Amino acid sequence: MKNPIIFGCQGLVLTAHERSFFKEFPPLGFILFKRNCSTKKQVISLINSLRDIVGEKVPILIDQEGGRVQRLSPPIWNAYPPPEVFGLIFNSDKEKARQLIKTNYQIIASELFDLGINVNCAPVIDLSEKRGHSVIGDRALGSDPKTVGVLGKAVIEGLESGGVSGMIKHIPGHGRAEVDSHESLPRIDSCLDDLLSREFSPFIQLRFAAAAMTGHLLFPKLDPTHPVTFSRKIINDIIRNLIKFEGILLSDDLSMNALSGSIDDRYINALEAGCDVGLHCNGNFQEMELVAKACPGIKNVAKSRIRVFLKKVADVSENREISDINELNVKLRKGLKGFFNFM
């Protein structure tokens, strides 16, 4: 089994150093960012290079949520509405919103599938909170847990019908965080009962998802010392036993400023706490080498979840529904008229 880490890479093509490193230390998968995406031909070539080294079925991840978070952006690729648009439609017409968001992510999946990308790090099922930091903002599907659960499920259905697996984030809920976890560690002082009725609810509704990504968040009333990604107590007691999430658990990006310690210590701490796979996004070669040297053995339970995840990704790709994308685009544009302006 490959090493339990997802790596980013530095640019539009692999360097000789990257090729050598990934061959010597094959990661479970890769994640792409804007710095890696210029044209369709270039992205396909980069992905083929990665798969030539690591294996043709290796997961290739991307954050293609719509709105502010689109690693594949116009004019080469389509513009997509921020997720909150579908929550607004849901307030007046639940079924219309559900169908439109499914269609939206079918179209996104089609673009990703054609490039060779097989995992989209979406949906965001954090709640929109008035006091929450704008890092979530319009990425959220709404403020009502049931709404977010229904629409999040439709996102996964849309992606899978297009041959791409989804990933729920940021478990167990980033919405109340008043600071950006890219910059510092958010502290959420809510009690368990309050969190269970709101933040945790969408994750409980989507506990069947194949994959989830942690939030780098401190919940002092659940674990006063460790952020979620490093908290054995929260991962075991809350994510696994209370939320009952059984899929593969990825850390959020280990290089984010919410976390402290060296990058290799962060990686070890995340896996020891119960994350199945670490995520390292920035392409910093020195950091990746430190992670590789620190890589521990994979626990049997993590091996089992990783195997299930890899099979799920392969099955979703193989069972893709063939749809008329032009017809879906017409349907989406018509349904979103007055809510989102396609440029």
Question: Model-found features: residue ranges?
Answer:
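N-terminal hydrophobic targeting/anchoring segments and the immediately downstream early-domain regions
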Residues: 1-60, 64-77, 343
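Active-site mouth loops of central-metabolism enzymes
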Residues: 3-16, 83-103, 182-197, 255-261
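Extended, intrinsically disordered, low-complexity segments
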Residues: 297-343
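Short, acidic/polar
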Residues: 10-24, 100-111, 197-202, 262-269
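Second-shell residues forming the walls of enzyme active-site clefts
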Residues: 7, 35-53, 58, 150-160, ...
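Glycine-rich anion/phosphate-binding loops
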Residues: 38-45, 90-110, 143-151, 193-196
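Glycine-rich, aromatic-flanked loop segments that form ligand/cofactor-binding clefts
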Residues: 53-81, 104-128, 148, 156-172
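A substrate-binding/cap region within the structured catalytic cores of diverse enzymes
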Residues: 88-117, 124-140
